[in-house]
UniProtKB/Swiss-Prot annotation, chain A:
Name of the protein described by the UniProt record: Acyl carrier protein
PTM field: 4'-phosphopantetheine is transferred from CoA to a specific serine of apo-ACP by AcpS. This modification is essential for activity because fatty acids are bound in thioester linkage to the sulfhydryl of the prosthetic group.
Domain of life, per lineage: Bacteria
UniProt subcellular location: Cytoplasm
Similarity annotation: Belongs to the acyl carrier protein (ACP) family.
Listed PANTHER family: ACYL CARRIER PROTEIN, CARRIER DOMAIN-CONTAINING PROTEIN
Pathway(s) it belongs to: Lipid metabolism; fatty acid biosynthesis
Organism this protein belongs to: Nitrobacter winogradskyi (strain ATCC 25391 / DSM 10237 / CIP 104748 / NCIMB 11846 / Nb-255)
A single GO cellular-component term on record: membrane
Length: 79, 243
């Protein structure tokens, strides 16, 4: 897993309080990791903070899985 | 109990009777306060009276840009915003059929839309910290209606709905949202009532007196504190018994 992937995973584990082994690329935040809609908003805010970039609403709507987040941040992370 | 040391509070309408009393009470409990209002010199005078732990942030709540800048300015000044007191409000009273569009728009903009924008910005900060206290000053007439105040009562009823929703959405994040619905409180706003109006009101109040800004401030201190219940949407009224 990429360095960004590891940081994404760490944030997801901390925010959702899930087992690290469940946080795989294909895991859906809502369907597999038990997040509700507010959790996903918070995750996006946490990603923005960690990676120093802005995630616009239309981009946030396409981030449904751990892999989606990693892919987006590999392209857009500033820190 | 009710110690607010280390907490940062933003109070709108701090130059008014109720807002001033709330800012003073939060400050007395140890909070750092950012006082906001339209009149810079009055705010400066108030700040000088309070002493340390005070920031002056003038803001015109009818301006979208001013409103959007206020919470970030408070965060920049205090490092955080733990408590938001959305207190500022205006009246443009008239008989319903004579209410002009601009009377409606002005009152909704300052009382309701600004409250929404400030609460939205503050909640974003608070949910990250897992602590926040949003307290909006509504009015008993938002529940009862009041002749001559179609715009004002609608704005205050709107605040109640907004705050109940906010409280329900963020309760799990440690952010509580509450309204205080004052009855007739002795302030410059109610000083404008004539004797006949005052008599009519007092006839309905079992305690036969107007409330005081300090009554409202005490409720605000409680709701801002760690001791306040974390269950959402408690609506407090302070009406000296009416209605």
């Amino acid at each position: 897993m990429s360095e960004i992937g590891e940081r994404v995973k760490k944030i997801v584990v901390e925010h959702l309080g899930v087992e690290p082994e469940k946080v795989v690329d294909s895991a859906s935040f809502i369907d597999d990791l038990g997040a509700d809609s507010l959790d996903t908003v918070e995750l996006v805010m946490a990603f923005e903070e960690e990676f120093g970039c802005e995630i616009p609403d239309d981009a946030a709507e396409t981030i449904l899985t751990v892999g989606d987040a990693t892919k987006f941040l590999e392209k857009n992370a500033k820190s | 109990m009710f110690d607010l040391t280390g907490k940062a509070a933003l109070v709108t309408g701090a130059t008014g009777g109720i807002g001033g009393a709330i800012a003073q009470a939060l400050h007395a409990q140890g909070a750092t306060v950012a006082i906001s209002g339209t009149r810079r010199e009055v705010l400066d005078g108030f700040a000088a009276k309070l002493g340390e732990r005070v920031h002056v942030l003038p803001c015109n709540l009818s301006s979208k840009d001013d409103v959007e800048a206020l919470v970030p300015a408070a965060e920049a000044a205090m490092g955080q915003v733990d408590i938001l007191i959305a207190n500022a409000g205006i009246t443009r009273d008239n008989l319903f059929v004579q209410l002009r569009d601009e009377d409606w728009d002005d009152v909704i903009a300052v009382n309701l839309t600004a409250t929404f924008r400030l609460a939205r910005a503050a909640t974003k900060l608070m949910m990250r910290k897992r602590f926040g206290r949003i307290i909006a000053i509504t009015s008993i007439v938002g529940v009862t209606g009041n002749p001559g105040q179609g715009n004002y009562t609608a704005s205050k009823a709107g605040i109640i709905g907004l705050i109940k929703t906010l409280g329900a959405e963020y309760a799990k994040r440690g952010v509580t949202a509450n309204c205080i619905a004052p009855g007739f409180i002795k302030t410059p706003m109610t000083d404008a009532l004539n004797d006949k109006q005052r008599e009519t009101i007092l006839a309905k109040v079992p305690a036969a007196r107007l409330g005081t800004p300090e009554d409202i401030a005490a409720a605000a201190v409680y709701l801002a504190s760690n001791e306040a219940p974390t269950s959402p949407d408690r609506r407090f009224t302070s009406t000296a018994g009416w209605p």
